[in-house]
Curated annotation (Swiss-Prot):
Quaternary structure annotation from Swiss-Prot or TrEMBL: Homodimer.
Enzyme class: transferase
InterPro entries named in the record: GATase_2_dom (IPR017932), GFAT (IPR005855), GFAT_N (IPR047084), GlmS/AgaS_SIS (IPR035466), GlmS/FrlB_SIS (IPR035490), Ntn_hydrolases_N (IPR029055), SIS_dom (IPR001347), SIS_dom_sf (IPR046348)
E.C. no: 2.6.1.16
UniProt GO cellular component terms: cytosol
Name of the protein in question: Glutamine--fructose-6-phosphate aminotransferase [isomerizing]
Gene: glmS
List of catalytic residues: C2, K605
Length: 610
């Protein structure tokens, strides 16, 4: 959600800022803007409603010279999408961009109006601009000193960058609940909400921690921690590919990322097998001692990550014999959970910056959990830094808002973790052997399945005029049905719901008619005969069935039942495998409906506010 880019350099930075915004478009936004300050303190600000391309075209018509600047893509929270509400916001010589939500903006707005300030937008960000201006006018000091005095007045989440056009040599950044990363250059430095924005200009990064305030000049970066003391933050060399944001020959990022899944899973497995066993030595030398004590697993996540957690619940209990609960982060953090003895908290997040998941992790430290383990796709993210242990998915950068390869690599890591914990609890060695064999075969199996893309594309037309869809699964395929429904609603805007197939008689059956497509995932397992009975219930009521079935499951297509035969797959990896055709189905339905596949309306890739 929202994107920030800033630069302090000896060269003109407007194009650096615009390119950074282009590389952040995946985060979701409705307007964009930038401000550039030249050496004489003249500010040039441009803001436009709509895409970054609109802003870029406007920039070509203006003189945007200057070595210091900030830019922003806005996802509307306070105030409608409009040019007036777009960032940057200005209060005389103070210019600011901001991600997050200032919860006490209304009383602060009244306070500033009482002090004689006039507001030209509906945003909470303009409040902060006026606060900084007032504080500097009243009490003086350097910009970083002023920002440090303003921060205690703010309640909520923010990642902000401030400049004072009277001193164009410095930017000040502050982070609380919304990520910021500093890019180090030679005689120039940068800041952004995601390192991807800065890869064209640097590969050296420094991640700000919670409560940090940073003073950024061309030659130096000073970081102050939440106590106001000078702090050192580790500088890392990014391994993210420069062209990670390139679609290549694919029409959409989502399509590219679906097809990247075999390689993403290979990368995630690399180095994690040893002598036919799962090797997770990256957890550290004390991990086995801690994991051997685990008597319960609590998984916390949001969205697609929640669905992967739901799958792993079946694995933890059936394979490792450990009770497991899965909860939505935004629910967990606002109740009073009774923590079980020796419970391990596992958090799941693609970005590692999901606001509710981070808040739940921080809460867990007060509740007496045995330890915390993050499964994440972004090294150096807040979730990784703040957890006791971390396992990285190695999916590579995921741009499409609708998660694909991050989901399947999360499941891959979770299954490896189940095997590792299970071994410590005396799990049958044959089970781990089956998991290892299944995971090693998985990339090739998915490659084989992707060859069915044209067949799946031919089914999409049947959804083009539908307003609702139902997804059914049983056992560990029920969360896969949930994920399939989520994908369809995210990118095609068709209302889709998922149910455990055994629940049909308890309500959903009332919805079945000829206008209700019903998608079923049907691997050849011990629940197949039960599932066939559920399918017959739908057929008897005229529902239009689309059954993704094991080729050995004994299904044949009929007038209102289309069978999509899939290769037989080892049961332990079937949930990962059956995810992919549902991703393809959703993608092709969205193409037919003409929606914005990579940036669906009202959604953002990284949900960094509550």
């Amino acid at each position: 959600m929202c994107g920030i880019v800033g630069a302090v350099a000896q060269r003109d930075v407007a194009e650096i800022l615009l390119e950074g915004l282009r590389r952040l478009e995946y985060r979701g936004y409705d307007s964009a803007g930038l401000a550039v300050v030249d050496s004489e303190g003249h500010v040039a600000r441009l803001r436009r409603l709509g895409k970054v391309q609109v802003l870029s075209q406007a920039a070509e018509e203006h003189e945007l010279h200057g070595g210091t600047g900030i830019a922003h893509t806005r996802w509307a929270t306070h105030g409608e999408p409009s040019e007036e509400n777009a960032h940057p916001h200005i209060s005389e010589h103070i210019t600011i961009v901001h991600n997050g939500i200032i919860e006490n903006h209304e009383p602060l707005r009244e306070l500033m109006i009482g002090r004689g300030y006039r507001f030209v937008s509906e945003t909470d960000t303009e409040v902060v601009a006026h606060l900084v201006h007032f504080e500097q006018k009243q009490n003086g000091g350097t910009l970083v000193e002023v920002v440090k005095r303003v921060i205690p007045q703010l309640r909520g989440a923010y990642g902000m960058v401030v400049l004072d056009n009277r001193d164009s040599s410095v930017l000040v950044a502050a982070r609380s609940g919304s990520p910021l990363v500093i890019g180090r250059g030679v005689g120039e430095n940068f800041i952004a909400s995601d390192q991807l924005a800065l890869l064209p200009v640097t590969r050296r990064f420094m991640f700000l921690e919670e409560g940090d305030v940073a003073e950024i000049t061309r030659r130096d970066v000073r970081v102050f921690d939440k106590s106001g003391q000078l702090a050192t933050r580790e500088e890392i060399e990014s391994k993210v590919s420069y062209d990670a944001g390139d679609k290549g020959a694919y029409r959409h990022y989502m399509q590219k990322e679906i097809y990247e899944q075999p390689m993403a899973i290979k990368n995630t497995l690399e180095g994690r097998f040893s002598h036919g066993e799962i090797n997770l030595s990256e957890l550290g030398p004390k991990a086995d001692e801690l994991l051997a004590k685990v008597e319960h697993v609590q998984i916390i996540a949001c969205g697609t990550s929640y669905n992967s957690g739901m799958v792993s619940r079946y694995w933890f209990e059936a394979l490792a014999g450990i009770p497991c609960d899965v909860e939505i982060a935004s629910e967990f953090r606002y109740r009073k959970p009774a923590v079980r003895k020796n419970s391990l908290m596992i958090t799941l997040s693609q970005s590692g910056e999901t606001a509710d998941t981070l808040a739940a992790l921080r809460l867990s430290k007060e509740l007496g959990y045995l330890g915390s383990l993050a499964i994440c796709n972004v090294a150096g993210s807040s979730l990784v830094r703040e957890s006791d242990m971390a396992l990285m998915t190695k999916a590579g950068v995921e741009i499409g808002v609708a998660s694909t390869k991050a989901f399947t690599t999360q499941l891959t890591v979770l299954l490896m973790l189940v095997a590792r914990v299970g071994r410590l609890r005396g799990m049958d060695a044959q089970i781990e052997h089956d998991i290892v064999h299944g995971l090693q075969a998985l990339p090739a199996r998915i490659e084989q399945m992707l060859s069915q893309d044209k067949l799946i594309e031919s089914l999409a037309e049947g959804f083009s005029d539908k307003h609702h869809a139902l997804f059914l699964g049983r056992g560990d395929q029920y969360p896969i049905a949930m994920e399939g429904a989520l994908k369809l609603k995210e990118i095609s805007y068709i209302h889709a719901e998922a149910y455990a197939a055994g629940e049909l008689k308890h309500g959903p059956l009332a919805l079945i008619d000829a206008d209700m497509p019903v998608v079923v995932v049907a691997p050849n397992n011990e629940l197949l005969e039960k599932l066939k009975s559920n399918i017959e219930e739908v057929r008897a009521r005229g529902g239009e069935l689309y059954v993704f079935a094991d080729e050995d499951a004994g299904f044949t297509s009929s007038e209102n039942m289309k069978i999509i035969p899939l290769p037989h797959i080892e049961e332990v990896i079937a949930p990962i495998f059956y995810t992919v055709p549902l991703q393809l189905l959703s993608y092709h339905v969205a193409l037919i409906k003409g929606t914005d596949v990579d940036q669906p309306r009202n959604l953002a890739k990284s949900v960094t506010v509550e």
